[in-house]
Amino acid sequence: MTSKIFRYPASGVNRRRLLQGLAGGVAATGAMTLFGPAVRAAKPIKIGYVSPKSGPLAAFAEADDFVLGEFRKLVKDGIKIGAQSYQVEVVTKDSQSNPNRAAEVAKELITRDNVSIILVGATPETNNPVATQCELEQIPCISTVAPWQTNFIGRQANPGDPKSWKPFDYTFHYFWGLEDVIGVFTGMWQQVATNKSVGALFPNDADGNAWGDKVVGFPPVLAKEGYKLTDPGRFQNLTDDFSSQISAFRGADAEIVTGVIIPPDFTTFWNQSRQKGFKPKVVSVAKALLFPTSVLALGKSGNNISTEVWWTPSHPYKSSLSGVSAAELAKGYEQASGKQWTQPIGFVHSLFEVAVDAMKRAGDPTDGAALAKAIGATKLDTIVGPVVFGSDKVPPFAAKNIAKTPLVGGQWRLNGEKYDMVVTENKQAPQIPLGGDMQALS
């Protein structure tokens, strides 16, 4: 695999070891009260949170302020862990949709803000550099909203050599995998009569390289299912000309288009496709079409475009923190913001569910090793579904660090002046109700 990996050199002494050394020095001078129970009990737990508040991935963070605001209300009186009550602070950082910036702010959270844990959830470009920094510094990290392969395999020293893959000690990730989205997409395609010719849009980033990988990505599975895949090759994000891809798809008579690209790139591709007369019967693209604002940018031509669906108000789950249902959380956001619900709402909320649950079981939430161990033992029903690490639903080599959540597929249907998400494929997660059948693009 040629996944792009972001590595950052470890300094000679990481934060955890430095603090251990300082503690030893204080003990030698007889000033042990600095690290005594009275001070520790009064010290708040600091949770770091990284997301792309600005830049091309900003749609993933659109609901952050609402979700974080609700969480702060829930913990305003602190959380009880054992016999002690801890105040909770959430320190947020903007990755600016830039992997290098994501690593920088993770480092700031660890060394300047002294957080006990970092939460992150918005594509590999945000997750991977943050998780890499946390693993180096021995700070627990929980991530989500990226296929698990991009997180576990993409962060390995040699992603192309499965024999060299090793589990991580401090970083944990939950979401669905490429095997799930392939099943969802093909399940939707089977509902529409096509020639099974598929055009692929795979950019030169962690997602694109993973999805287009000839061993673990789309190509081998689609070939086995009888689909002919046309992959014109990798392209850079924020490309302004998709002429070569459109030409290749027309040459292959592609009636299906798939891929995993950022929202502005799909808008460019789709507008140019319409201008050039390329009109496939089915378009199922990940990442770009998750948000109603992205589909609205396409005008009426966005009707019946399909995508993966990881969370909706109709998901039959509730929060372990507040007890609110998925429907209630989505309604709360719409009432507070005046905007339509978006999928990340549920997953950002769930990050704090998993974090609080682990902190309560860790005993000492400031003990990184104990907290990491508690995260790895998580078996929690959340607002996005069960989060269970060590499950047999994940290949053994990744089970320590990865948990899977349910995935369905759906289409955007024009409803007056807005688009509604209609779930059209749920074979892999029948507990999530269907809203209708697949329809071909007009």
Describe each PLM feature range.
Residues 48-71, 93-99, 122-123, 201-212, ...:
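Extracytoplasmic "Venus flytrap"
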